[in-house]
From Swiss-Prot:
Name of the protein described by the UniProt record: Uncharacterized J domain-containing protein C63.13
Lineage, uppermost ranks: Eukaryota, Fungi, Dikarya, Ascomycota, Taphrinomycotina
Record key words, sorted: Chaperone, Endoplasmic reticulum, Membrane, Transmembrane, Transmembrane helix
Domain J span(s) in chain numbering: 4-71
Subcellular locations according to the entry: Endoplasmic reticulum membrane
GO molecular function, one term: unfolded protein binding
Keyword field contains Transmembrane: yes
Biological process per Gene Ontology, one example term: chaperone-mediated protein folding
Any Pfam family matching the protein: DnaJ
Topological category with respect to the lipid bilayer: Single-pass membrane protein
Length: 208
């Protein structure tokens, strides 16, 4: 099935790269399965995966140009999605021939992790990153043994610094991996704070 990736991100085909990235952040935060109630999680997961498909295609100039050419073609659209045909295929596929649910979710999490780390850096002076770190410190204490750059030790609250997205613990865990291990209520709170910050930021786009 040929999917309208511009519609999925709520942007026009004329959207700039910056507008595409902003739209992805907004849509990914809105649909992230960890931000919604358990009853809405299945639907959110489906939407989150579609949002990540769209960003994968539209964030790359070459893939976007190819997608635009196929969208404009008067010939019948391919039955398989553009994402399925251009993304490296996993070993296991769904019965429909596309990537399996597990692969799509793993891909979505991996792509979102990059943006999550970026948002951690962007909000380090606005309290969200510090709130994240305070939660981590409360939950795990000194056992995590976080290291940032060349400074070892446990870093909680404001001591976490401005580069939390780069932090690894002694076992090589990224900040996003730590986030994924948080209780559901804390994950939802962090994602909602990120979304609120994005919507209230000075730079917003209207590409509808």
């Amino acid at each position: 099935m040929f999917k309208d990736y511009y519609a999925i991100l709520n942007i026009t085909p004329k959207a700039s790269a910056e507008e595409i990235k902003y739209a992805y952040k907004k849509a990914a935060l809105e649909t992230h399965p960890d931000r919604v109630s358990p009853s809405a999680r299945a639907r959110a997961t489906e939407q989150f995966q579609l949002v990540n498909e769209a960003y994968y295609v539209l964030s790359d100039n070459s893939r976007r140009a190819q997608y635009d050419r196929e969208s404009a073609s008067s010939s019948a659209k391919p039955r398989q999605s553009f994402f399925s045909r251009t993304n490296p295929q996993p070993q296991s596929q769904s019965q429909q021939g596309g990537p399996s649910f597990g692969f799509r979710q793993s891909f979505s999490d991996s792509q979102f992790e990059q943006v999550f780390n970026e948002m951690m850096n962007e909000t380090s002076t606005r309290g969200i990153a510090n709130a994240f770190w305070t939660i981590v410190g409360t939950l795990a204490g000194a056992a995590l043994g976080f290291i940032t750059f060349d400074v070892p030790g446990v870093l909680v609250g404001s001591a976490a610094g401005a580069k939390l997205g780069r932090i690894r613990d002694t076992h090589g865990k990224s900040a996003y991996s730590v986030f994924q291990d948080m209780p559901a209520v804390e994950k939802a709170r962090i994602l909602t704070q990120f979304l609120s910050h994005l919507l209230n930021s000075s730079k917003q786009f209207t590409s509808s």
